[in-house]
Amino acid sequence: MTSHPPRNLGLDLVRATEAAALAAARWMGVGKPDEADQAAAEAMYGVLNTLDMQGRIVVGEEGKLGVHSPLDSGRMVGTGNGPEVDVVVDPVDGRRRLAQGHSDAISVVGVAPRDSMWSPSPAVYMEKIVVDRAAADAMVPECIDAPAAWTLALVARVKKKPVRDLVVFVLERPRHEHLVEEIRSAGARVLLRSDGDIAGAMMAAHPLIDVDLLMGAGGIAEGVIAACVVKALGGMMLGRLAPQTEEEWAAVRAAGLDTKAVLSCGELVRGNEIFFAATGITDGLMLEGVRLHGSEAETESIVLRAETGTRRKIHTVHRLTD
């Protein structure tokens, strides 16, 4: 039995994201994010268990719904045959956007060899900066603490465009009010989203999408998944623990975690045997959403393999059985 993921694993993973997207699409615009997430999680779990791998979920669903999910961290997925791998999942990235019928809700899964993914439990939040491959070599740890204007000027210089042409993805949160002011004062434009920072990282890292950076604090779970995407696309991500409450600070200190270390995507997910798949649930900048046509449905997905830099777009027509 090989310890290395097979080269076609990404094409198997996309079946899991397609199943999750199809299940979640039924809940688009009905105002019930928890129900959508639960349906997507169950569908994804069912497909993951058919894949020949010994998968351990490193970043899962616990904490989202207030109840246990089949995709909680620590759960094993796969047939029990095949390589030992770490698995990161988000059946619905952009839960609120999906519930409201908004754009860019996606279903995602990433896989890498066992023990290669950062898992700083019990920390919850981290600061993040993401750029594409054109600006990857310009990113330095100092960017995390530097004024936004400094980082924006750095990116603008290497991308040979004025700061006013830059677009920065930021989660719309009270904690980001000052960051948004900084970005706008520097002359750049802000793409504010209520949630979906995995999609935001994909936009910032993708060379063909007109989003230049992701900045701000978000979940560690989403950060580890984003690191898989960014590494596979050849971009760069910087991250650092950023506890948001006294309780989280206390837990992080008790665990002896380093809150000063700035990590790159290569440290968040080690090695190059990384596979990532995403399927659109609602229409977005990167992927079309699910199209339901009675007894059939259409999906659009992206499959990434870090080792080769391969990027596949897949359009699928599904025959529905219920």
Q: What is each of the regions a protein language model found here?
A:
Residues 230-284:
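Glycine-rich phosphate/nucleotide-binding loop
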Residues 49-50, 76-82, 90, 99-102, ...:
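Solvent-exposed alpha-helices and their adjacent loops that cap or buttress functional pockets
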Residues 1-88, 150, 198-199, 203, ...:
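N-terminal subdomain of lithium-sensitive/metallo-dependent phosphomonoesterases centered on the IMPase/IPPase/PAP
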Residues 188-198, 211-213, 218, 222-254, ...:
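Gly/Ser/Thr-rich active-site loops/lids in small-molecule metabolic enzymes
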Residues 108-193, 284-291, 295-321:
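Acidic beta-strand-loop-alpha-helix segment within the catalytic core
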Residues 69-70, 100-102, 121-123, 178-184, ...:
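Short acidic, glycine/serine/threonine-rich loops at helix termini
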Residues 82-93, 97-118:
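DPxDG-like acidic metal-binding loop motif
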Residues 57-61, 87-89, 98-100, 119-120, ...:
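General beta-strand structural signal in soluble alpha/beta enzymes
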